[in-house]
Regions:
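Membrane-helix interface linkers and caps
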Residues: 2-10, 30, 34-102, 118-131, ...
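Alpha-helical transmembrane segments
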Residues: 16-28, 64-68, 101-112
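C-terminal membrane module of polytopic membrane proteins
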Residues: 39, 176-181, 202-275
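Juxtamembrane helix-entry segments on the extracytoplasmic side of multipass membrane proteins
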Residues: 127-140, 173-187
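Hydrophobic alpha-helical segments embedded in the membrane of multi-pass proteins
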Residues: 186-195
Length: 275
């Protein structure tokens, strides 16, 4: 059932356009308090009135859940969008081969460590190889809120509708239109989107597997933070480039139309041709 949703060319495109507009609106609303209270995030120390801090917290959470919130609203209220149940049904598709959960859980580790190795090879020795995050509740929140708040939208709603018409890279490339601070953020977002699309399609549309991958990235990023002194933010750029390298390997090793194994994609094409 879920695999059919991934490959279904009949899903209408209009709902995803409405979804994209709604995501942009929600993200914009989430940015307003930051522009009002913290125009320069590099100088943010947390020394703000309690009401402003609370508003910033609400804004962060609103932006974090924007993609999924928009997807649920559009699927629920817009004719032809499939209904909210069809979206939540993908969350029940958790019975996939265990190797995909291992990949989702462990893949960020070699990628992040590779960035640290490159950092050392460049002669920059101020590394923190493994730390326990000081804000454990924040780390737990980062492992839960972004996967739940984003993947119902990006993977569960947008990807099946976009990839058959415009290509599997469009859902990830569309993140270029999200507001961000630096180029490395776009590189990382698009690269992780390719990786998550690969997992999603290869598992026949398993949102739990993708959410594990998303959560694993956030958790491992907290435990393997990399450079301790990095005024030019070279460390995050190296991490983003390593994610880009992993995404390129996936693209080269799979069918570029679906990011699934070439043999698997050929068998699907033969089955469609036979019917």
């Amino acid at each position: 059932m879920q695999a059919a949703a991934v490959d279904n060319p009949r899903l209408p495109l209009r709902p995803v356009l409405v979804w994209a507009a709604l995501v942009a609106i929600i993200s914009g609303l989430g940015l307003i308090p930051f522009y009002a209270f913290v125009p320069d995030l590099s100088k943010f120390t947390g020394n703000l009135p309690a009401a402003q801090l609370a508003l910033l917290g609400i804004a962060v959470e609103l932006a974090a859940v924007g993609p999924s919130l928009a997807a649920i609203l559009v699927a629920w209220r817009m004719p032809g969008a499939g209904g909210a149940r069809s979206l939540f049904r993908q969350f029940r598709h958790w019975r996939v081969h265990p190797i995909w959960y291992l990949i989702a859980l462990l893949l960020p580790i070699p990628i992040l460590l590779a960035a640290d190795v490159i950092w050392m090879a460049l002669g920059r020795q101020s590394l923190v190889w493994l730390t326990v995050p000081g804000a454990i509740p924040f780390t737990i929140g980062a492992a839960l809120v972004p996967p739940l708040g984003e993947e119902f939208g990006w993977r569960g709603f947008a990807q099946p509708r976009l990839q058959r018409r415009l290509g599997v890279f469009v859902p990830g490339g569309s993140k270029l239109f999200l507001p961000s601070d630096v180029a490395q953020t776009y590189i990382r977002l698009i690269s992780t989107a390719v990786i998550y699309a690969w997992i999603y399609n290869s598992t026949g549309g398993s949102l739990p597997a993708v959410m594990v991958a998303h959560a694993a990235h956030n958790i491992h990023s907290g435990f393997i933070p990399g450079a301790s002194v990095d005024p030019r933010h070279l460390g995050p750029l190296l991490g983003a480039l390593c994610y880009a390298a992993a995404a390129i390997v996936i693209v080269l090793a799979t069918n570029r139309g679906t990011l699934t194994r070439r043999l698997q994609a050929s068998h699907r094409a033969l089955r469609r041709g036979g019917t």
